[in-house]
Amino acid sequence: MLSLRTSISRIQPCLFIRASSYQTEATQPKFQDKIRIRIQGGDGGQGCSSFIKEKFRPYGPPDGGNGGDGGSVYVAVKPGSFNNLSHLSQIHKASNGTNGKGGNRHGSCGKSVILYVPPGTVIREISAVRSEQSLEWVQMPGKTKPPKLKKGQISFVSEATRHGKELLYYRASSMISGAAEYSLEECDTTPQILCYGGVGGLGNVHFLSENNRSPKFATKGLTGEQKLIELELKTICEIGLVGLPNAGKSTLLNCLTASKSKVGEYEFTTIYPKIGTIKTTMPDDHSSFQYRLADIPGIIKGASDGKGLGYDFLRHVERAKMLCLVIDINPKAKIPADQAFQLLWDELNKYEKNLINKVALVIANKADTAAEQDLLLLKAIVERTTKGVAVLPVSAKKQEGLEGLVRGMTQLLQQRLLV
């Protein structure tokens, strides 16, 4: 059997900060990492047409308040609360603003909606319904038809319309949509707007003029935006563990982070990404350093073309700072170690050429069952294919070589973070 240079008897798991896989697959809700949902901002409330009531005066000065703005739809990251997108419903609508009232009382704004998502979520706008916003009038109660115009009043009506449009444009200028794609990192905990609510209508006090001292009309509020958006989770982690099914990635993650990933002797035990956190102490200054480690579902030949689970989950390693290829070097492995490495290398290269530049370490797992020759064959093909990528033998099952592995991953990651 192969003797591990960095072998240790038993090591305690590194301090566990959080693993998104704390529950087993059997107890977790359905995993969703790509969904489409409809979002809609609330409509603005109507402006009010009213007057101050005074004795012997049918219409005092106008005092109609504005309608409240409709609520908007926001998105924000909530670290540690979600590990996928299954908690989001298909439709999210903000509340409408309430109507204005007499006495210059403005309507209240509608309640906004915040969509909380895990870090690593990308949001794309698929389509948007932006109806042409026109100025619609609201008459005083009991006056369903526009008042008949007398001679000389046409100029006033056109002036009021122009003034109303200017005011609404000024109030609605913030409704100009932003970027069509958002990429949310762990630091994006401040809500970002996705869909604006409509601004409230104008009360009749805005239409007081020399030509009309008793304006008996107000305006309706504008409608809120409507959008169809797509949310895609691309897991954020510093290091991604990539390997064929049954290479021992889940066992490795469990040992290093005290995660609770499911382990089995059949293919595709892991059916969605699991994340654990390694916390270690640097030997030079004894400072604390932590990073996230992701167990990516097993990749098979043709994964870059959509076969198996690979196509859906290869995107989860796109944002990783560094990749570690986990190779089973057990002589009884279904695919020999050298062929397994070449297969993984080819699939990563086909999916996105930049991914192979992230490969910094090859972990030769199950080294306690392998001979020296098996490790030498793997090292030979790695040296021919890569530029300076090291091969480190470990045994996750027996927890041998893990201390050296953590030390090596930490050093390599720090080097990449400094670039």
Curated annotation (Swiss-Prot):
GO MF annotation: an example: magnesium ion binding
Superkingdom in the source lineage: Eukaryota
Domain OBG-type G: 237-414
All residue ranges annotated as the Obg domain in the record: 29-236
Keyword Nucleotide-binding: yes
GO biological process: mitochondrial large ribosomal subunit assembly
Location(s) in or outside the cell: Mitochondrion
GO cellular component, one term: mitochondrial matrix
SUPFAM superfamilies on file: Obg GTP-binding protein N-terminal domain, P-loop containing nucleoside triphosphate hydrolases
Main subcellular location of this protein, as a coarse class: mitochondrion
Protein residues bound to GTP: 243-250, 295-299, 364-367
InterPro entries per UniProt: G_OBG (IPR031167), GTP-bd (IPR006073), GTP-bd_Obg/CgtA (IPR014100), GTP1-OBG_CS (IPR006074), GTP1_OBG_dom (IPR006169), GTP1_OBG_dom_sf (IPR036726), OBG_GTPase (IPR045086), P-loop_NTPase (IPR027417)
Gene3D superfamilies linked to this entry: GTP1/OBG domain, P-loop containing nucleotide triphosphate hydrolases
Keyword Nucleotide-binding part of the UniProt annotation: yes
Keywords in alphabetical order: GTP-binding, Mitochondrion, Nucleotide-binding, Transit peptide
Family to which the UniProt record says this protein belongs: Belongs to the TRAFAC class OBG-HflX-like GTPase superfamily. OBG GTPase family.
NCBIfam families according to UniProt: PRK12299.1
Name of the protein: Uncharacterized GTP-binding protein P8A3.11c, mitochondrial
Organism this protein belongs to: Schizosaccharomyces pombe (strain 972 / ATCC 24843)
